[in-house]
């Protein structure tokens, strides 16, 4: 093994041990650490906050793994109304919104949103945080030249991230000639090949949302999603994707159907929910107009 390997290994181990050392955004792309960066206060595995310093209209970033601690010990000490952002966790957030939202929270922006609430808005997973130095590296998305071949649907996922949900997909679609089940030896190989497909199967993993959805869109590849409480919201807000009641339904689509979907999605106006600039401007507007 060469010296560079050990340098990278040391760097990764250091980042895991000291999570506040390296927290870059993925701008111009979305990531959890991007939302974290544009917040006024942070309460997560590496930062705490002073509730007395939360001013009217401020944005608080919360890792929902710590939601019970935050709401039991900090939120009740806040005297001003504020915006809440929850990200960087696989937790289904609906139960916490129902339990904790009150008049002090002007609006709650949430990853893995799984209910409709007038004071809650879905925010995307986006890319894996850049600090992981894996799938979220910006170099994978710089090229906008997508050379589409006769590859229609890619299925490339780790079934052990959610075995009960993902393993049946292999059996259901194993004879579908338009679906390619591929494993890749590196991230570079994955993204190079991904760009040649039109659609990407995106089953839920450890949480409802997954970086796979947003990586695919940045590569000109549209997600195929099974309907659930989270993906129903994505459908409502107009995310270009094929939505299925059951994975078996995918076996009813032929090449013409996929081509029709692909043409329709390509001709749809740009979907700004996948733009970090959109969210920065939205938050800036909220803070100035409330």
Please describe what each predicted stretch is.
Residues 2-214, 222-239, 261-287:
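Nucleotide-sugar donor-binding catalytic core of glycosyltransferases
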Residues 217:
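Short alpha-helix at the nucleotide-sugar/activated-sugar donor binding site of glycosyltransferases
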């Amino acid at each position: 093994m060469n010296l560079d390997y050990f340098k990278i290994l040391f760097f990764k181990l250091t980042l895991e041990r000291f999570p506040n050392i390296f927290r870059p955004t993925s701008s111009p792309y979305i990531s959890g650490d991007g939302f974290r960066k544009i917040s006024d206060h942070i309460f997560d595995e590496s930062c705490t906050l002073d509730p007395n310093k939360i001013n009217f209209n401020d944005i608080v970033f919360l890792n929902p793994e710590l939601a019970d601690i935050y709401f039991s010990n900090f939120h009740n000490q806040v005297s001003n109304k504020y915006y809440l952002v929850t990200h960087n966790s696989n937790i289904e957030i609906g139960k916490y919104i129902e339990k904790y939202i009150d008049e002090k929270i002007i609006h709650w922006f949430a990853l893995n949103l799984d209910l409709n609430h007038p004071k809650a808005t879905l925010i995307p997973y986006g890319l894996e945080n850049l600090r992981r130095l894996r799938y979220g590296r910006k170099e994978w998305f710089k090229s906008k030249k997508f050379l589409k071949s006769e590859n229609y649907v890619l299925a490339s996922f780790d079934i052990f991230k959610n075995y009960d949900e993902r393993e049946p997909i292999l059996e259901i679609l194993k004879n579908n000639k338009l679906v390619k089940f591929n494993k890749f030896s590196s991230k570079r190989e994955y993204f190079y090949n991904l760009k040649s497909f039109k659609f990407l199967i995106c089953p839920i993993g450890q949480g409802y949302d997954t970086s796979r959805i947003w990586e695919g869109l940045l590569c000109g590849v549209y997600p195929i999603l099974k309907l659930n409480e989270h993906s129903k919201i994505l459908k409502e807000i107009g995310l270009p994707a094929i939505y299925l009641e059951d994975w078996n339904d995918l076996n009813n689509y032929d090449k013409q159907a996929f081509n029709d979907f692909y043409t329709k999605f390509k001709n749809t106006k740009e979907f700004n929910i996948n733009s970090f600039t959109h969210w920065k401007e939205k938050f800036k507007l909220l803070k100035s107009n409330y």
